């Protein structure tokens, strides 16, 4: 009953839930069916921000003022809540960056220093001077959102698409073959969708993550489409130090109910 009450509270707090919109047939009640793209705002979250956060808002780069200290505490509380929600531990970090999953992938690319300035690269052909065996390689799945594909293709890395199996999932046999084919590359990264934002097919992340780690590859998971609907475990509950624990996850919180206005979270 507690969960039912919570769901009812969320549903009844959606801003615009009873809103009408003019159309060719006159005003009609809005039926929102695009949660794959974005969630909608919740009244109790917006009320809390207006009444409890904004009156004390200040720059989080300083704690020398009371308002700066309070705003910084809010931010750090948010980090802790998110870390707990994804079963993170002291080895994991929560970052806030950019817009949605696009901002998170972009941040990881910058951290790994995988991108050259476009204008300089076009003028001097720096990427072409990197021999193939020295290039990083990125393995992606058959149904990636553009944020988990296009950004990787704009780096110095080679992007390898792993085809799907008969069930529409990442084909583990093909993934193993590709990992062996590129075994000598200096940096190997697997970046796969936890769920397709087109078909809704959910990937079993454990065997894919385990296979990536068995071949010394970093395991990244795009939970943009899946996060509002499935549990997320950064560290496998049965073996936190085991091969099924994830290295990086990408979350797009604006897809959650109450999420509009939030940053991406890697």
Q: Where would I find each of the regions flagged by the language model?
A:
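Pyridoxal 5′-phosphate
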Residues: 1-266
């Amino acid at each position: 009953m507690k969960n039912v009450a919570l769901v009812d509270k969320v549903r009844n707090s959606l801003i615009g839930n009873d809103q009408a919109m003019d159309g060719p047939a006159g005003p009609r009640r809005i039926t929102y069916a695009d949660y794959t793209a974005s969630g909608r705002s919740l009244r109790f979250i917006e009320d809390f921000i207006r009444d409890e956060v904004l009156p004390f808002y200040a720059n989080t780069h300083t704690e020398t003022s009371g308002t700066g200290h309070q705003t910084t505490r809010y931010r750090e509380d948010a980090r802790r809540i998110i870390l707990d929600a994804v079963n993170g531990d002291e080895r994991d970090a929560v970052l806030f960056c950019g817009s949605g999953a696009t901002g998170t992938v972009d941040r990881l690319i910058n951290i790994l220093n995988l991108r050259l300035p476009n204008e300089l690269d076009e003028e001097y052909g720096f990427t072409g001077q990197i021999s193939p065996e020295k290039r990083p390689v990125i393995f992606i799945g058959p149904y990636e959102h553009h944020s988990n594909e296009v950004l990787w293709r704009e780096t110095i890395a080679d992007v390898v698409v792993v085809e799907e199996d008969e069930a529409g999932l990442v084909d583990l046999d093909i993934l193993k073959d590709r990992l062996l084919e590129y075994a000598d590359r200096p940096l190997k990264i697997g970046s796969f969708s936890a769920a397709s934002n087109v078909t809704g097919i959910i990937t079993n992340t454990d065997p894919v993550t385990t296979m990536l780690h068995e071949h010394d590859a970093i395991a990244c998971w795009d939970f943009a489409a899946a996060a509002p609907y499935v549990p997320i475990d950064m560290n496998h509950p049965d073996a936190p130090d085991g091969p099924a624990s994830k290295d990086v996850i990408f979350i797009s919180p604006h897809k959650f109910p109450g999420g509009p206005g939030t940053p991406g979270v890697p």
